[in-house]
Amino acid sequence: MPKETVILAYSGGLDTSCVLKWLLDKQYEVICVLADVGQKEDFTAAEKKALKIGAKKVIVADVKQSFVEDYIWPAVQMGLVYEERYLLGTSLARPCISVALMEVAREYGAKYLAHGATGKGNDQVRFELCAYALKPDLKIIAPWRDVEFCCQFQGRQDLIAYAQQHGIEVSAKPATPWSTDANILHISYESGILEDPNTVAPENLYEMTVDPLTRAPRDPVHLVIQFDRGLPSSVEDLPGGRVYTKPLEMLDFLNKLGGSYGIGRIDIVENRFVGLKSRGVYETPGGTILFAAHQDLEVFALDREVLRTKQVLRDRMADYVYNGFWFSPEAIYARKCIELAEQRVSGKVTVELAPGYCRAIARKAAKDVGALYNEQLVSMDVHGGYVPQDAGGFIAINAVRIREHVRAFGAYDVPTKKN
């Protein structure tokens, strides 16, 4: 009887290497897929490792360009931020990786997908919801939810012992007391010593950014970022005079420059979809710069009520992405609505980078879209187009409900300072 084929989302690390061997012991034929989303990884070494363990095939899927153009750029366009601070670096990578996994599953006729996501985290939800949206007939193998697997592997030491027993290479490099997840948009750090929310993250944890207080340049630097319908279209390095127009190059440049100024660090406690609170430390230098520039241009370009409606949809969409619903009907609907609003968000923003922060300092709308900002109309030195006397009636109408509240319940009791 032929063996069933399993597609394993493989990283080359200890966990998924042990999962690979465990699946082989269960008489599955395993095809490993390593997704290159811009992390610093020795893919050749990981491929050799998986083949040595017994994988039938190892596929390295270079999805960096798709990740930037199809996921990160739309996230910038939509202004996605989860719980007001997290720019969704890990969440956005999961649907991108899932597409690569499903393409391999179709090519090889696999009926099973396996992953190494823990039973307490969000990634199990993200990978599996994406898989069911893209290939509904797929069956999931989640070892960290398997009773037998969890009894066999109580923790990292059990995994190390199992690896040594089966000749699986274990890194000689001491493990950091936290876990990381990296891609071209960000690096996240969690678990280990970071599980105590009162523990300050050590400085040697950070990989993408320098300490803004001690190692960042003192003098600010300026950039001009161009947007076309809400999507980043170019970045001009004013000091260097170079213009970047390719998405991968733009983000790479912003990551390096923003990282050199210590921009994009956050340390937060967030609400996982599975109901737990978790502490995460994140570095997102380039994404932080793009978010700030886009937000400034958006407020400049959009009608006030359109902007407020868009912000409601943005917050819902951020939840959808964080929770794993990128391919859901509600997410597709929200994105289409936001894209319609963003048709007016074209122009350029001048951004200043300084130690630990960035800010927009100038903006200009593209000529072909026009601008709601009317310099003549808003000027205190130019008359016409706006009748100041009309403001009296506007104020009187808005005061009606306040006066009625006072009539019914009495005047507001304003506290006074005691001598």
UniProtKB/Swiss-Prot annotation:
HAMAP family: Arg_succ_synth_type1. It comes from Drosophila melanogaster (Fruit fly). GO terms for biological process: argininosuccinate metabolic process; L-arginine biosynthetic process; urea cycle. Keywords: Amino-acid biosynthesis, Arginine biosynthesis, ATP-binding, Ligase, Nucleotide-binding, Urea cycle. Pathway: Amino-acid biosynthesis; L-arginine biosynthesis; L-arginine from L-ornithine and carbamoyl phosphate: step 2/3; Nitrogen metabolism; urea cycle; (N(omega)-L-arginino)succinate from L-aspartate and L-citrulline: step 1/1. GO terms for cellular component: cytoplasm. Its EC number is 6.3.4.5. L-citrulline binds at Y86, S91, N122, R126, S179, S188, E270, Y282. It catalyses: L-citrulline + L-aspartate + ATP = 2-(N(omega)-L-arginino)succinate + AMP + diphosphate + H(+). InterPro entries: Arginosuc_syn_C, Arginosuc_syn_N, Arginosuc_synth, Arginosuc_synth_CS, Arginosuc_synth_type_1_subfam, AS_cat/multimer_dom_body, Rossmann-like_a/b/a_fold. ATP binds at residues 9-17, 35, 114-122. It holds the Pfam family Arginosuc_syn_C. Homotetramer. This is Argininosuccinate synthase. GO terms for molecular function: argininosuccinate synthase activity; ATP binding. Belongs to the argininosuccinate synthase family. Type 1 subfamily.
